[in-house]
């Protein structure tokens, strides 16, 4: 009886590990003001355990002509092609579905923000919060996983 109980307990205790997802993969970025798709970002894990996100696709939108280069961006992003640009850097997994300590670049404005991210329970949405100083002074976006 004890072995049966222990087996069931261990099964449920470790089941979340087998279903755990991380943020690696391709994500559709969505304009937080209009809801229109902006492009795709591929998030990969670096050898030091941090996560980096690179623009892999720019989605054409009515009334918007995307920039080809990161004109107003600080070094090391200045005058680099936007396609292939690392817009997320140094993001670290903190616990469970939470990621912190990263930086995110807005290639349209050239501004770099501190970044936190939280993966949804089903792993299909990534809630990003870019901010300066404190998280209250920031902006949020929800990205959708591309399958």
Predicted feature locations:
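Central antiparallel beta-sheet cores of small beta-barrel/beta-sandwich binding domains
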Residues: 29-115
């Amino acid at each position: 009886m004890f072995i049966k109980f222990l087996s069931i307990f261990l099964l449920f205790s470790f089941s979340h590990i087998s279903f755990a997802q991380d943020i690696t993969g391709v994500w559709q970025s969505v304009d937080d003001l209009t809801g229109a798709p902006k492009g795709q970002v591929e998030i990969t894990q670096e050898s030091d355990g941090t996560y980096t996100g690179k623009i892999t696709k720019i989605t054409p939108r009515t009334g918007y002509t995307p920039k080809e280069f990161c004109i107003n961006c600080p070094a090391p992003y200045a005058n680099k092609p936007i396609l292939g640009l690392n817009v997320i850097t140094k993001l670290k997994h903190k616990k469970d579905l939470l990621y912190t300590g990263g930086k995110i670049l807005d290639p349209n404005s050239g501004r770099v923000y501190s970044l936190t991210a939280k993966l949804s329970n089903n792993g299909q949405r990534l809630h990003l919060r870019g901010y300066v100083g404190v998280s209250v002074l920031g902006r949020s976006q929800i990205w959708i996983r591309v399958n």
